Regions:
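N-terminal secretory signal peptides
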Residues: 1-22, 29-38
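Bacterial lipoprotein signal-peptidase II cleavage site
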Residues: 40-48
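Early extracytoplasmic/lumenal segment of secretory-pathway proteins
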Residues: 62-136
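Extracytoplasmic ligand-binding site segments that recognize negatively charged/polar headgroups
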Residues: 78, 83-86, 106-109, 123-124, ...
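A bilobed periplasmic-binding-protein/Venus flytrap-type ligand-binding module shared by bacterial periplasmic
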Residues: 184-189, 225-229, 305-320, 336-337
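Periplasmic-binding protein-like
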Residues: 240-249, 289-315
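Conserved C-terminal helix/tail region of periplasmic/extracytoplasmic solute-binding proteins
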Residues: 264, 368-399
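Mature extracytoplasmic/periplasmic domains
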Residues: 312-373
Length: 399
């Protein structure tokens, strides 16, 4: 593809970004309806017996050379909704002869873990857990180590995203993308200049019934703990008790917990204030009809998260799984992921193919002067008091 044509293609894709964790919209079906039909079937169906397929694949600019790949002709993925570029999936299937494709959806890391604990091992090849859940998956024997000789494009990952606490030896996961949790605002309705989590809680009663919140405990605990000046990973009973008061004060004003299509009530002004991720909201900002939408990285601090690609234990199609991991980090392919999902790539080589308007978008690629506000997550999801508060909060929504 000519450089000029590629840039035009990427800019066109940028105008139609989709939510990181939102279900497929009917308008997006097009020639991809066959893929969606496969999604509805899921891995609960008896796997087909695909014939092996091989492909050397075209060498992407900046990507590492790899030997011709022999795949099983099938790949079963368990992932967040709407979290891969449709074009990239079509390209992967065509290049590697993947005729049997399954894409099942989970709405939270907790559900992914629960399904694997319930016996789903061996049903799927690949998943995309958030980084802090990787240790629990390793401990539960739910992952297979990645053979990096089959994923040479791992070398394109920025060093600051390697050998981190959740995988200190880089054995189990490949960074997918990263983003933030923040405040989404329809400014033509919300007239206050909300720049902190503290202000978010203060104005919430005024917009009662018009607040959308992601259905993710780690993200939700971020808001009260940061508003109070604490670590978002706190398990201190006193600090969590204060956070509980803020959350229970917020709960009656929340329209819904929604991790999948939270941008839609924001689009329709059914919700005008949100505790959300960047993806999807970025789409509203780019739409002239909803250009008053704003995404704020709170000044009192917030969560930055990273999602990762993992190969699940006993994968039915291990060669296809490795081929996919290498494919998805080819620079031009990875650039399309960033454009499609509106989340930052850890692959520096991909930035050459990302339009300047996205590279310079501070809600996607967080500037160096804002990054100190961000705090990474630890695995505190099983802390009994946090679990208790979360269940109490969920049961009080809209009440």
């Amino acid at each position: 593809v000519a450089e000029q044509d590629l840039d035009q293609l990427l800019r066109q894709m940028a105008r139609t970004r989709v939510n990181r964790r939102g279900f497929m919209k009917a308008a997006g079906l097009g020639s991809f309806s066959a893929w969606l039909a496969a999604c509805s079937g899921g891995a609960s169906q008896a796997p087909a017996s695909p014939s092996a397929a091989s492909s050397p694949g075209p060498a992407a600019s900046g990507s590492a050379s790899a030997a011709p790949v022999q795949t099983e002709g099938a790949l079963y993925m368990y992932n967040w909704a709407d979290y891969i570029s449709e074009e990239n999936i079509e390209t992967f299937r065509e290049r590697f002869g993947i005729t049997d494709w399954t894409y099942d959806i989970y709405p939270s890391n907790e559900e992914l873990l629960t399904k694997l604990q319930g016996g789903a091992t061996g049903l799927y090849d690949i998943a995309a857990p958030t980084a802090e859940f990787v240790p629990a998956l390793v401990q539960g024997n739910f992952l297979q180590k990645i053979d990096w000789s089959k994923v040479p494009n791992q070398q394109l990952i920025n060093e600051k995203f390697k050998k981190l606490w959740w995988d200190p030896n880089d054995e189990w996961q490949l960074p997918k993308d990263w983003g933030t949790t923040g405040i989404s605002i329809r400014t033509k309705v919300v007239t206050e200049d909300v720049r902190t989590w503290k202000q978010f809680f203060e104005v919430a009663p005024k917009y009662s019934g018009r607040i959308i919140v992601v259905d993710s405990p780690g993200d939700v605990f971020t808001a009260p703990l940061k508003a109070l000046g604490y670590s978002l990973n706190s398990v201190d009973p006193t600090e969590l008790g204060q956070a509980r008061e803020l959350l229970m004060g917020l709960a009656p004003h929340v329209l819904a917990l929604n991790s999948d299509t939270y941008e839609e009530p924001m689009r329709d002004e059914e919700a005008v204030l949100g505790l959300t991720w960047t993806g999807g909201i970025d789409e509203l900002i780019a739409d002239p009809a909803t250009a008053d939408t704003k995404y704020v990285i709170p000044e009192d601090g917030t969560l930055y998260w990273m999602d990762t690609w993992v190969i699940l234990a006993d994968p039915p199609h291990p060669e296809a799984a490795h081929a996919f991991l290498n494919f998805i980090h080819e620079p031009e392919i990875q650039a399309k992921e960033t454009i499609s999902n509106a989340y930052a790539t850890p692959n520096d080589a991909a930035k050459e193919f990302i339009p300047e308007e996205i590279l310079n978008d501070p809600t996607i690629f967080v500037p160096d002067d804002i990054f100190p506000r961000l705090e990474g997550a630890q695995d505190v999801s099983t802390d009994p008091l946090r679990v208790e508060i979360w269940e109490e909060f969920k049961s009080s929504i809209g009440g």
